[in-house]
């Protein structure tokens, strides 16, 4: 990784590494090198779970353990981490083996989610728990502001359907527009049409379901529900 690329990704992350080799390792998939990011991912997963659990405990003093567990699961699950990775354009910085590169690993949700966890682990090792906690809370600031006990744990398709039903409006329609890639590594493009809105919403994902959820999420934002 050259100096310019390293500086760019650190600017995006909001953190400058003292030990640059930790950044490189966090971005290295096992297909590219024996010095890959899986151990960092293991560490980052535990740190993320703790930081989010503590944030929920502090922000919601009157809710029970069950609600906190569901909210934490929503915030640390793979697709949420992948969303953060997309926001950071992490796919551009991944070190992948030729096989993974050709099969589109740079956009695979699981690889992106694991990389976010690995970065958390690497930042902790490069600094301390206080620094990485502050950074995670910055990354999650808007998500922590929006989340609340109850129906926010439902997926976007369900929330969109329930919202439209509550307004006595027609249910949304989903159409496959494109399927790209080989059978084991496909990227789906879906259009979601809502009768009350003049535009359709494009969703993408590694499965039809994920693409539909992505499109529904965009419709909810347009409707002002999220």
UniProtKB/Swiss-Prot annotation:
Subunit structure and binding partners: Homodimer.
Catalyzed reaction equations: Endonucleolytic cleavage to 5'-phosphomonoester
Gene this protein is translated from: rnc
Residue ranges of domain RNase III in the record: 6-128
Keyword tRNA processing in record: yes
Functional description taken from the UniProt entry: Digests double-stranded RNA. Involved in the processing of primary rRNA transcript to yield the immediate precursors to the large and small rRNAs (23S and 16S). Processes some mRNAs, and tRNAs when they are encoded in the rRNA operon. Processes pre-crRNA and tracrRNA of type II CRISPR loci if present in the organism.
Record lineage: Bacteria, Pseudomonadati, Pseudomonadota, Gammaproteobacteria, Enterobacterales
Name used for this protein in its record: Ribonuclease 3
Similarity-based family: Belongs to the ribonuclease III family.
Keyword Cell membrane part of the UniProt annotation: no
First-listed, main subcellular location of the protein, grouped into a coarse class: cytoplasm
Cofactors (names): Mg(2+)
One Gene Ontology MF term: ribonuclease III activity
InterPro entries for the chain: dsRBD_dom, RNase_III, RNase_III_dom, RNase_III_sf
